[in-house]
Amino acid sequence: MAMARYAAFLRGVMPMNCKMPALKAAFEAAGFTDVKTVLGSGNVVFDARSGSETMLQQQAEAAMQDHLGRAFLTIVRSIDQLRKLLATDPYKPFKVSPKAKRIVTFLRGRPTAKLKLPVELDGARILTMKQGEIFSAYLPTPKGPVFMALIEKTFGKDQTTRTWDTVAKVAR
């Protein structure tokens, strides 16, 4: 079986609740190789024998439970898949303001919610969905990222969100 490069996006990780060297060690204990963390927010890139995203997610979560004493919801995508996503620029048709933050929400499964898009709430717009990803943009406000409540209400908590810039850093 050939090795492939993957990215794991973990929900709820921040430097205060998970040290990156410990996270890296947990992924290595899961049998993944060439493991690197990207930024301090739960982004891990690694090599693994090709397998289903679901299998890799379960493997990573089990290793975190064993080595960190807790598991973070993990969503895996292949690096090839992320590069294709970046190349398509799903924001292009929407005339997104240069000041807006572009964000991608990765879903654990396929979306079950039927939404007429784009949806707007307090300056945040959910623009489009493609398979397991939702693309949004918002202008930062003092209220913070209000769209997160809308995304959770619509798609549940089996998801995690990253900025477009973070996805680009992870896919490099």
Predicted stretch roles:
Residues 2-41, 45-172:
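Surface-exposed, charge/polar-rich loops and edge strands
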